[in-house]
Amino acid sequence: MPPVALGVLTEAILENTMNHDIELQQAVQAELGWEPSVVAAHIGVTANAGVVTLTGHVETYASKFAAETAARRVKGVKAVAEEIEVKLPYDIKRSDEDIAAAAIDRLAWDVCVPPDAIKVMVQDGRATLTGEVGWHYQQEAAEQDVRRLYGVIGVTNHVSIKPTVNVSNLSDDIAHALHRSWYFDPNTIAISADAGKVRLTGTARSPHEKQIAALTAWSAPGVTAVENDITLN
């Protein structure tokens, strides 16, 4: 190909990529504006080849989580780099002791969390959860309970999952569940499992489908970890 033609082609590709980035940026901004728990005016959005970066500040950790979730569900988003800062208003600041006490109370009232299974440590508004549960949904419920509390600016979930059932047919069980779903073609997702640890490979059409595949795997009895290596096509 002549140098001039190659240069024109390269310029066209770059222009197309730039236009896609602008469209994706605008789509994410629109989705943030559509999310009632997020003040979109406080969040900056940039996009580069499907990777979206969020900056700015919010007043609660729950809003920060909601902003990231909103960005992930936009078509064309491959990954989200989240750099949002939580700036608590003075009237909702809480001491670490108050946050820990509130977290313990919230967990105790949640029917999805086994009694006395979770321990909470809070330092400078950042909560760390430890303990052991039998299911992923219990692990997620505990984190959800704590991230919505006043004064929390971050949550680290170190709760482990201890399988309580035989996991010998784990790959087959997950494969059957995926194949029952209208989201997936049986030939697009591969599953491997070793003693409760599951790895997903293959392709999905969107981050949402990729997430659904992981949630489906987590629903299988005995799963302790899911490595989601599904790529987007």
Q: Locations of the language-model features?
A:
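N-terminal targeting leaders
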Residues: 1-233
